[in-house]
């Protein structure tokens, strides 16, 4: 389905938007996109043009999860300015009630690839925060969600995990889940 959706974007970013919640994107929905999945308000498979950037922009009351699939990103902004993201890095930014401003920049001469997910926080008005994770081979790394008493990730009922699965291996998930594969079948 991803390859049949319109490729859009802005500034130096091109993306295929799979989820666009009308709660955030009033009047901007694109044909074929889902209008949200639970607290998931946005899901995009994006690439930055060589030396492309998003320009400085703001977020408020949204949790932004960025997963680097290919290439690198240089992060500028009010949270962890100067951070570099490489393949398998996962950046989790909570805008909360105070919000944050940021710009993502491709420092390289070639395109890169990133998955971005926006989640609506379960509790409004939380303070802004920033976390970094690294996806591991053969192991699930929780990058978002979990009970309120834990502090390893932003607490939420929706859990987001990332992993690498070697060719020929399988992953079993009890209960219902949604998976997004960046390569393979």
Predicted ranges, named:
Residues 60-79, 87-90, 167-169, 173-185:
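Glycine- and acidic-residue-biased ligand/ion/polar-headgroup-sensing regions
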Residues 124-127, 138:
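C-terminal, non-catalytic macromolecule-binding modules
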Residues 1-7:
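Hydrophobic transmembrane alpha-helices and immediately adjacent juxtamembrane helices
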Residues 79-86, 105-108, 130-134:
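"Short basic amphipathic alpha-helical interaction patches in structured regions
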């Amino acid at each position: 389905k991803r390859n049949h959706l319109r490729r859009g974007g802005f500034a130096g970013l091109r993306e295929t938007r799979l989820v666009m919640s009308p709660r955030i994107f009033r009047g901007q929905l694109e044909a074929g996109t889902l209008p949200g999945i639970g607290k998931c308000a946005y899901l995009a498979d994006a690439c930055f043009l060589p030396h492309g950037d998003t320009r400085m922009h703001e977020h408020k009351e949204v949790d932004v999860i960025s997963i680097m699939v290919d290439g690198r990103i240089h992060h500028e902004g009010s949270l962890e300015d100067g951070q570099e993201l490489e393949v398998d890095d996962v950046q989790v930014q909570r805008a909360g009630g105070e919000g944050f401003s940021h710009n993502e920049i491709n420092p390289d001469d070639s395109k890169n690839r990133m998955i971005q997910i926006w989640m609506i926080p379960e509790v409004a008005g939380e303070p802004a925060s920033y976390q970094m994770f690294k996806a591991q081979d053969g192991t699930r790394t929780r990058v978002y969600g979990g009970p309120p008493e834990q502090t390893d990730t932003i607490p939420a009922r929706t859990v987001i995990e990332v992993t690498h699965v070697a060719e020929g291996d399988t992953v079993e998930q009890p209960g219902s889940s949604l998976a997004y594969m960046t390569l393979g079948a």
